[in-house]
Design a protein with these regions (language model features):
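Long, charged/polar, low-complexity intrinsically disordered N-terminal extensions
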Residues: 1-122
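Acidic, contiguous N-terminal accessory segments
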Residues: 7-10, 113-203, 209-212
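Structural motif
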Residues: 203-207, 457-461, 486-489, 508-510, ...
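Long, hydrophobic alpha/beta structural blocks
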Residues: 209, 226-244, 248, 268, ...
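Long, continuous compositionally biased terminal/linker segments
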Residues: 233-281
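A domain-level signal for caspase-like cysteine endopeptidase catalytic cores
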Residues: 318-504
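Catalytic cores of nucleophile-dependent amide-cleaving enzymes
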Residues: 503-588
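Caspase-like cysteine protease fold
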Residues: 522-524, 583-711
Length: 711
C-alpha cells in the first residue's frame, strides 16, 4: 500500500506516511485511537487508504478549508468556521499533504486558529478517514529490456498511476505521474506499481514507430499494450481501427475520449454548468455513459465518428516528436504524463540556411548579413562596418556561429499550440526536451510561493535598456521576489552567478563559439567543470543554444535560447515580454508561444530542457491570455485562452470572473464572450495583470484599463 496510517507513539492521533511522495504528517484526536482498516468505498472520492477510529474531534496542524457534502455527495458548504446539524457527511480538508477525507454521522463544527484546523463532533463517534496520495512523483521505476515487444509490458503499466477509471480521471489531480522506465536486463516492477485492469487493449506491431505514438493512450486508458496487426484499440465486443494514417487516428482517439470524459464527469462528483456540455450538438446519454466501466464507455465514445466531434474539440496543447529509437524510452512516462500527442518520425528533414525556417542567413560563417537599421547591432561579436556598430568588433568572421557539427532539424508542422522534440538534433520552432531536465522537475516538486529569486545579468553597456526588465519582475501581489541586477561580470563572477541558487537567470549580452562574453575573457559552459544552481533561464544573446544546453546538462531545468544572431532591438522587446510572462506564472514553452504571436523574431528562439518550468504560480492557476475587441457601442468582445500550467493540467476547470458568463470551461478550451459591457470588462482587467491581445498587438491588462474608461 502506498500510504501507511499508524497511531502516534507519544500523543493522541495518527501519523500518515505517503511512500510515493515521501512525505509524512500528523493529525491529532481528542483521545488515543487504534485505526482499523475500512473499505475505500466508504468515501465519496477515491482514496488509496482508509481507516476508522473512534474520536470526538480531529485536528490538523495547518490552516485549511473544510468542504462538507451530504451522504449522497451534494455539496453543502465550505469554509473554516461553521457548524452543521445531525446528518451523514463526507468532509474534505484542503490543503493537506495528501488528499484527506472524513466520513461520519454526527453534528459537527469547524474552527481554525492561526496554525490549526479543528473538526469537533458533538459526541465521540466512529470517523472513517481516507487518504489519497497527490502522486506528483512516480510510484517507482520499472526496469525493462528496450526491444519493442518487451517494452510493451512496461508501457502497459503507465496507467497504474491513475487514481480512478471513471471520467473524473480527466481532472489532473486524479491522474498521478506515470512510473518511470529505465533499461534493464529483464522486467522488474516495484511493489507499489500495481496494474489497473481497465479491460482496454491496444494492439500494435512490435516496432518503436507504432509503440511510441500510443504511450499517452496507454496511460490515459490504463490499457494493456500487446503485439499484433493491424493496429487497433479494443475491448470486449468492440474494435476501433488505428489505420489508415496511424498517428493521426491515435491522436484523434485521445482527443475524442478526453473531451467526452470532461463532458460526462458533470454527472459525477462535480455537476457544474460546463460550457462544452451545454453547447455540444451530440445527443448522448451522458449519465448512462458515466456509469459504464471504462472499456465499455470508451467503446461507445469511439463509435461516434470523429468528424461529428471534431468541430467541438479545443486545440490540443502539445505534440511531442519522439524519434523511434531505444535510447528515448526513458522519456516516455514524462511525455505520457503530459497527455501529449506523440509522433515517431523515422526520417529527419535537415534545416538549411536560407530557408524560411528561422535560420536565415545566420548559420555558419557570416558571409552575408541580415539587414539592420543604421543604429542597430546584433548580440554576437562579429565584424561590422562602422555605420552598424557591433559588440566585440575585434572578432573573426566565425564568431557567433553555431558549431559546425550541430545538426538542425525541421520537424513537420503540428496542429497543437506547442511542440516538443525528443531525440538527436536541434529542432526549429520546437522545445528540445531532455531527460535530465524532466528528472529535475521531479526533484523540484511544486513551485514554492514564499520568495522567488531572479538574477538579471547585463554584460554590455549598449544593452542596458533590456536590463530594465528587473522592474518587470516582482509586479505581483502575494508573491515576493528577490531581484538582483548585476553588470559587467568577470569570468569568475559569472561562474559564481551560475552556481548560485536562483530561480530565474535573465542574461543579456554576447554569446559566441567561445562561450559567454565576460569583461575579462569568455566562459564556455560546454567545456567548464562547474556547478549550476540556476533553475531556469533566458539567454538573450546570439546563438546561445549550446550554452543553454550545457546549463541544462549541468543542473538547470530549462530555458529559452537563440538559434541565430538576434538584432538588439527585437531581442530587447522579446526579453521584456518573457520577463512579464514568467513573472505572471507562465511556463517557458507557453511564454515563448505568446511572444511569437507578437514578434516574428520569436521564431529565432526555442526552449531547451523542461518546457513546463515555471518560476511562480499564476494567480489564476492556469495560464490565461486574453483577446479583446470592440463589439458595439459600450461593449466588447472578450476571448480567453487557458493553457495548462504546472499542477493545473489539461482537464482543469476554470471560470471567468464576469457576470456575462456563469459557465465553467475546461483547459484547453477557449471562452468567447460577444458583448461584455465596459464596466464589466474594466473589472475583469483589474483583477490581475494578464497578457491581452488588442488589435493584434500584445498589451497588459493594466495598460488597457483607460480604454474602458473612455466608453
Amino acid at each position: 500500500m502506498s500510504i501507511d496510517i499508524d497511531p502516534l507513539p507519544d500523543a493522541a492521533g495518527l501519523t500518515v506516511t505517503d511512500h510515493i511522495e515521501n512525505t509524512q504528517f500528523e493529525l491529532y484526536t481528542d483521545r488515543p485511537v487504534e485505526p482499523a482498516a475500512a473499505p475505500e468505498t466508504a468515501h465519496y472520492f477515491p482514496v488509496d487508504a482508509s481507516v476508522t477510529v473512534e474520536t470526538g474531534g480531529i485536528e490538523i496542524p495547518r490552516v485549511a478549508v473544510v468542504e462538507a457534502r451530504s451522504g449522497d455527495g451534494t455539496l453543502l458548504t465550505r469554509g473554516d468556521d461553521y457548524a452543521l446539524p445531525a446528518g451523514e457527511y463526507h468532509v474534505g480538508i484542503d490543503p493537506a499533504p495528501t488528499k484527506l477525507y472524513l466520513s461520519f454521522s454526527s453534528p459537527f463544527a469547524v474552527s481554525t486558529t492561526d496554525r490549526t484546523t479543528r473538526i469537533d463532533l458533538d459526541a465521540p463517534a466512529e470517523v472513517t478517514l481516507g487518504f489519497r496520495s497527490l502522486h506528483q512523483v512516480p510510484a517507482g521505476t520499472i526496469e525493462t529490456p528496450t526491444d519493442p515487444e518487451s517494452l510493451m509490458d512496461a508501457v502497459s503499466l503507465l496507467g497504474s498511476a491513475l487514481q480512478t477509471t471513471s471520467p473524473e480521471r480527466s481532472f489532473p489531480t486524479l491522474r498521478g505521474h506515470p512510473p518511470l522506465i529505465e533499461p534493464g536486463e529483464r522486467l522488474r516492477v516495484p511493489d507499489r506499481v500495481e496494474p489497473t485492469d481497465s479491460g482496454v487493449r491496444i494492439v500494435v506491431p512490435p516496432e518503436y514507430r507504432y509503440l511510441y505514438p500510443v504511450v499517452s493512450l496507454a496511460y490515459y486508458f490504463a490499457a494493456e499494450v500487446v503485439p499484433g496487426d493491424p493496429p487497433r484499440i479494443e475491448g470486449d465486443g468492440w474494435t476501433h481501427a488505428l489505420e489508415p494514417d496511424f498517428e493521426r487516428r491515435a491522436a484523434e482517439a485521445l482527443r475524442q475520449a478526453f473531451h467526452f470524459d470532461c463532458l460526462a464527469r458533470t454527472e459525477g462528483f462535480y455537476p457544474v454548468d460546463l460550457h462544452e456540455r451545454e453547447t455540444t450538438a451530440l445527443d448522448l446519454d451522458w449519465g448512462r455513459l458515466y456509469d459504464l466501466p471504462l472499456a465499455t464507455r470508451l467503446g461507445e465514445y469511439l463509435a461516434v465518428p470523429f468528424e461529428r466531434v471534431e468541430p467541438e474539440l479545443p486545440q490540443w496543447t502539445l505534440t511531442t516528436d519522439v524519434r523511434p529509437e531505444p535510447e528515448n524510452v526513458e522519456l516516455l512516462p514524462f511525455v505520457a504524463g503530459e497527455l501529449s500527442i506523440v509522433r515517431a518520425p523515422e526520417t529527419v528533414t535537415p534545416a538549411t540556411a536560407g530557408a524560411d525556417n528561422g535560420l536565415g542567413f545566420f548559420r555558419g560563417p557570416r558571409t552575408e548579413a541580415a539587414p539592420l537599421g543604421p543604429n542597430e547591432f546584433v548580440r554576437g561579436a562579429t565584424e561590422a562596418p562602422p555605420a552598424a556598430p557591433t559588440r566585440g568588433a575585434d572578432a573573426s568572421g566565425e564568431r557567433g556561429a553555431v558549431a559546425a557539427d550541430t545538426e538542425f532539424v525541421q520537424p513537420e508542422p503540428v496542429d497543437t499550440v506547442e511542440h516538443a522534440w525528443v531525440g538527436a538534433g536541434v529542432p526549429l520552432d520546437a522545445n528540445k526536451a531532455t531527460l535530465d531536465a524532466y528528472h529535475r522537475r521531479l526533484e523540484a516538486g511544486a513551485v514554492e510561493q514564499s520568495r522567488i529569486s531572479v538574477l538579471v545579468v547585463c554584460n554590455d553597456e549598449q544593452m542596458r535598456a533590456e536590463g530594465e526588465v528587473a522592474d518587470l519582475y516582482g509586479l505581483r501581489d502575494m508573491v515576493q521576489f528577490d531581484i538582483d541586477v548585476r553588470h559587467d561580470l568577470t569570468r569568475e563572477e559569472m561562474r559564481e552567478a551560475l552556481a548560485s541558487d536562483v530561480d530565474f537567470l535573465h542574461y543579456i549580452g554576447h554569446v559566441d563559439d567561445r562561450g559567454m562574453q565576460c569583461t575579462d575573457e569568455y566562459l564556455d559552459l560546454t567545456n567548464e567543470d562547474l556547478a549550476v544552481g540556476v533553475s531556469a533561464f533566458l539567454l538573450n544573446a546570439c546563438q546561445s543554444y549550446q550554452q543553454g544546453e550545457a546549463l541544462v546538462h549541468r543542473g538547470s531545468r530549462g530555458g529559452i535560447v537563440t538559434l541565430t544572431d538576434v538584432a538588439n532591438s527585437p531581442a530587447t522587446q522579446l526579453g521584456r515580454i518573457i520577463a512579464r510572462l514568467m513573472n505572471s506564472g507562465f511556463n517557458l514553452r507557453t511564454a515563448l508561444h505568446v511572444a511569437k504571436r507578437e514578434l516574428i523574431t520569436g521564431h529565432q528562439y526555442i526552449v531547451v530542457g523542461d518546457g513546463g518550468t515555471t518560476i511562480c504560480q499564476s494567480r489564476s492557476g492556469v495560464a490565461v491570455v486574453g483577446n479583446i475587441g470592440e463589439s458595439s457601442s459600450g461593449s466588447w468582445s472578450l476571448g480567453v485562452q487557458a493553457y495548462p500550467n504546472g499542477p493545473y493540467g489539461v482537464g482543469t476547470l476554470y471560470k471567468l470572473a464576469t457576470s456575462s458568463s456563469d459557465a465553467n470551461y475546461f483547459v484547453p478550451s477557449t471562452c468567447e464572450l460577444k458583448s461584455v459591457p465596459s464596466t464589466e470588462l474594466s473589472d475583469w482587467l483589474g483583477l490581475e495583470t494578464l497578457p491581452i491581445f488588442y488589435r493584434d498587438e500584445l498589451h497588459w491588462s493594466d495598460e488597457l484599463l483607460p480604454l474602458t474608461d473612455q466608453e
